[in-house]
Structures are given as structure tokens and as C-alpha cells.
């Protein structure tokens, strides 16, 4: 938690227009956004945001109209998002990997009026059924922030998790800003003293809220690595003190540190905040050996990314932490329900799915099976949609079987699922090894190692939960945009 003197300096700001005004006044001359070549202060950024607002207003847009953004995680993309939302319009950050036909499809589905595009993507949006502008465009004059209600829609994010088809989750201003404030609550001093390298896409709620809006809330410096592939060359230049990354990226960074040394990360990295997927305790331990604190948490797009955070990882490494302030949670038949300012408005154009997830009195049904310990720390047990139903009627969570496997340092990822063997139902596991841990060992030794590991884990499990079929993969799993292992292999 923040020191008391810093906690007194931050407050809940319910809308993006108020937020943009506040950060300009609060952090005016501190460095705000940088691409490692050019660095802009908060005052300069807010002036550019005001000019982008004026440009958008010149198109005759109405409050609530939708503006899409297609770019890498650049300073211009951040400024355009702030401009769209502080002008009273609704921002949609499109994933940079979308093929041209999907971009056009999104424009049609969401009724997008303006599409702001980064230079690398201009060719891909020819024929878009809306006005297309360069993301760098600004007007000569400025425009004031709009007046909006905290419950007005601010942004739409794609969500689908590891199983379902993508949906458009509508987040109001209050939700974005509650999520952003939750991201300020981190251990140690936070205000005006950190450098963040943005290694996540802004189309992901984790990248936009925790890795961007929370950074600005703190008066910290936000650095673009451009295309994620450029991260390797940028981190030693940026010298970040904090990173926000999904576990898949943390695994990649750890492997590179083992190859090139800690200097690869810039030499000043102290904290990594991770989420959007299970954070294995072994990963926490390996970063701790490097003097880097890795903290996990829990959140979902429908809850503006942040619901719990765990700063007590050494004594509770498998927990996702405690609830952030001003949120309620309850467990209904094993499923986590939560509500608060961070809750979404519904899925765009899908009242049926909205009714399945959001109750009339504001509770989000997460689909996650959880438990709380006596001190209020939450633990993920599994996903309702992932349950394996045995022939005897028993429900098994594959995540509960996967958990002990993740304690092994030679395993990168695994997937437990239902399968068939000799005409009967069995529990199967697919394992992706950390192949670098095996040196030049032949593949047969790798397979033998994990067959032995399965035997050891099976000895700790009830007979109905034991793994009967094992596959050791040479190729990576199919993954989601958050680099989680997809359940649909």
C-alpha cells in the first residue's frame, strides 16, 4: 500500500475529462510520455490531447459516437485515447494484429465514425467505411474537455477469455478510473518517481488501465517500446523501474535475462506487476533471486482489469491477493461475484450475454471458482466453463490438477483436459517444457522426465483426478491475446 503521505495526494476521479485536467495541474512539468527519442511533459501531452479533441470535434461528432484507434502502443495512441474519452466520445482500441477485413468488420459492427491509424497500418485500412485520420493529426487550436457523467460509456474492449468468442465489453468512465486508481496501490513510494516501459498492447485492458492510466495517475513516466518485438532493444535504453506484464511475457524476459544478464532489463527494475493469467510461484521465486519483486493479482475486462492484488507473495505465493478498496465480493455456489464502480455496462449489442453475466443489482458473475482464506486472501480454483464432468457425475477443475505441475522449474506451461483412451474417459495433460533447462539432452530424456513428474503428482491426487495420458509438446500452445494458453487447442 502507498505510504500515508502519498495516499493523501491521490483521490478517486470519476471521469476521463476530469482526469486529464487533474494530471495536467498535478504533474505539469514532470516527464509524461516518451518514445525514447522525444519526451513530453504532462503539460505538453495535455496540450496535444486538447488539439486532438479539437480535431475530433471538427468532424461533427456527437457525444457517445465511437472512435477507433489502430496503432502499436505509441505516445500518439495514448494521446488519442485521452482525446477521444475526454471529448465525450467512446474509444475502441483495435488489436494491432487484426487483418484488414476484420478492421472493416469492426467498423461496421460498432458503427465507428472515425478511425485514427498509425503509419504502419494505413495500407490495411483502405476501404474502411468511416473517416480515416492519421493518429498524429492535431488541430491548430485546442478544445476544452467535455462534460460527461461517470456512468457514460468511455471505451469498448474485446474480451473472450480462453474459451468464448470475442465480445465487446462497454466500460463507463467510473470503471476505467476506479481501475486506474487501483493500479496506484502498489508497495513503496509511487508518485512521480517511476519509469514504465509499456510492453502490453493498449487494446488489452491490462495494457490500457494498469500499464497506462495508472502510470499517469502516479505522475510517472510512460515509455513506448513501439512494436512489442522492439522490447529487447528498448529496455536497456529506458531502464524501467517498474513493468506491467502478463506471465507469458515475464517468462520470455526471464529467459532473456538468463541468456544476456540482468542488464538486459536496464539494471534498475524493481517491481513487475503481472496478471491476466496464472502467475506460477516458481516464476515469482526466480525473479526474486534476481532482486526483482513480482506481484500477481486478479481481474477481468468486465471489472476494469483490477479486482484483487497480492503484495504478500512470499507467504501466499498461490493467492491472487485481497480485494482493492470500494469493491464487494461474494462466493455463490463456488463462483466469484463482485460489484463496485469498476463494473462494466454490458456487452455491445448482446443483451443475452449481458444478462448472463451482469445481474440487475450490479453483480458480475465471473465464471471463476474461488475460495477465500481466513485473512481475506483469494485463491483461484478454476473456471466453471472448464470443468470436466466424470462419468460418475463428479466435477473436476483442470486448473486444480495443473497447479502442482507449475511448481516444477522445467515446465513452462501445461494444459489438462478430458480425453479418451481405449474407449474410456481419461484425464490428459499436454506439457510444454522449458527446453533450455535440459541442455543438449535427447528428446527421450525430456519425455521421461515429465512422465516421472506425472507419476509424482498423481501420487498426491485422488484416483479420479489422476492423469492417464501425457503429451510433451515441441511446439507452443495456441494462445490468447494475453498469451494465456487457449483451452481450444
Predicted regions and their residues:
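N-lobe entry segment of adenylate-forming
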Residues: 1-40, 44-59, 63
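Conserved AMP-binding/adenylate-forming
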Residues: 38, 53-98
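Conserved AMP-binding A3 loop
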Residues: 41-43, 154-180
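Conserved pre-ATP/AMP-binding loop-to-beta segment of ANL
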Residues: 141-158, 165, 189-195
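Conserved AMP-binding/adenylation subdomain of ANL enzymes
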Residues: 177-195, 202-263, 268
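Gly/Ser/Thr-rich phosphate-binding loop
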Residues: 235, 241-245, 253-315, 328
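Conserved ATP/PPi-binding loop(s) of AMP-dependent carboxylate-activating enzymes
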Residues: 322-325, 333-357, 377, 392-396
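AMP-binding/adenylate-forming catalytic core of the ANL superfamily
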Residues: 340, 346, 369-463
Amino acid at each position: 500500500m502507498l505510504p500515508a503521505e502519498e495516499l493523501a495526494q491521490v483521490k478517486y476521479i470519476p471521469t476521463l475529462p476530469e482526469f486529464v485536467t487533474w494530471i495536467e495541474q498535478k504533474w505539469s512539468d514532470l516527464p509524461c510520455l516518451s518514445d525514447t527519442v522525444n519526451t513530453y511533459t504532462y503539460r505538453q501531452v495535455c496540450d496535444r490531447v486538447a488539439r486532438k479533441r479539437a480535431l475530433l470535434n471538427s468532424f461533427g461528432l456527437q457525444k457517445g459516437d465511437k472512435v477507433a484507434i489502430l496503432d502499436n502502443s505509441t505516445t500518439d495512441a495514448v494521446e488519442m485515447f485521452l482525446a477521444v474519452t475526454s471529448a465525450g466520445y467512446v474509444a475502441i482500441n483495435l488489436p494491432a494484429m487484426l487483418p484488414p477485413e476484420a478492421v472493416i468488420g469492426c467498423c461496421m459492427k460498432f458503427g465507428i465514425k472515425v478511425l485514427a491509424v498509425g503509419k504502419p497500418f494505413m495500407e490495411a485500412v483502405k476501404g474502411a467505411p468511416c473517416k480515416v485520420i492519421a493518429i498524429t493529426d492535431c488541430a491548430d487550436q485546442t478544445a476544452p474537455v467535455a462534460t460527461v457523467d461517470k456512468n457514460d460509456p468511455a471505451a469498448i474492449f474485446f474480451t473472450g477469455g480462453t474459451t468464448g468468442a470475442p465480445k465487446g465489453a462497454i466500460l463507463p468512465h467510473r470503471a476505467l478510473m476506479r481501475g486506474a486508481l487501483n493500479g496506484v496501490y502498489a508497495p513503496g513510494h509511487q508518485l512521480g518517481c517511476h519509469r514504465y516501459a509499456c510492453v502490453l498492447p493498449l487494446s488489452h485492458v491490462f495494457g490500457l488501465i494498469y500499464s497506462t492510466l495508472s502510470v499517469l495517475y502516479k505522475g510517472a513516466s510512460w515509455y513506448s517500446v513501439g512494436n512489442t518485438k522492439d522490447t529487447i532493444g528498448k529496455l536497456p535504453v529506458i531502464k524501467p523501474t517498474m513493468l506491467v506484464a502478463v506471465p507469458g511475457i515475464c517468462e520470455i524476459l526471464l529467459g532473456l535475462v538468463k541468456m544476456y544478464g540482468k542488464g538486459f532489463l536496464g539494471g534498475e527494475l524493481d517491481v513487475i506487476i503481472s496478471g491476466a493469467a496464472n502467475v506460477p510461484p516458481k516464476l515469482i521465486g526466480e525473479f526474486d533471486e534476481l532482486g526483482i519483486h513480482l506481484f500477481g493479482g486478479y481481474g477481468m475486462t468486465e471489472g476494469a482489469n483490477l479486482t484483487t492484488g497480492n503484495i504478500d507473495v512470499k507467504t501466499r505465493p498461490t493467492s491472487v491477493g485481497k480485494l482493492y478498496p470500494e469493491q464487494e465480493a461474494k462466493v455463490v455456489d463456488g463462483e466469484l461475484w463482485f460489484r463496485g464502480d469498476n463494473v462494466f455496462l454490458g456487452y455491445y449489442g448482446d443483451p443475452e450475454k449481458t444478462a448472463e453475466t451482469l445481474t440487475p443489482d450490479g453483480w458480475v458473475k465471473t465464471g471463476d471458482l474461488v475460495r477465500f482464506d481466513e485473512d481475506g486472501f483469494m485463491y483461484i480454483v478454476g473456471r466453471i466453463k472448464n470443468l470436466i464432468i466424470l462419468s460418475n457425475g463428479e466435477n473436476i477443475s483442470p486448473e486444480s490438477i495443473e497447479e502442482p505441475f507449475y511448481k516444477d522449474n522445467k515446465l513452462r506451461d501445461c494444459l489438462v483436459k478430458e480425453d479418451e483412451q481405449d474407449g474410456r474417459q481419461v484425464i490428459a495433460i499436454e506439457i510444454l517444457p522449458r527446453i533450455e533447462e535440459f541442455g543438449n539432452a535427447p528428446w527421450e530424456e525430456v519425455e521421461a522426465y515429465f512422465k516421472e513428474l506425472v507419476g509424482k503428482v498423481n501420487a498426491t491426487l485422488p484416483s479420479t483426478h489422476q492423469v492417464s495420458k501425457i503429451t510433451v509438446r515441441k511446439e507452443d500452445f495456441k494462445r490468447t491475446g494475453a498469451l494465456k494458453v487457449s483451452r481450444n487447442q
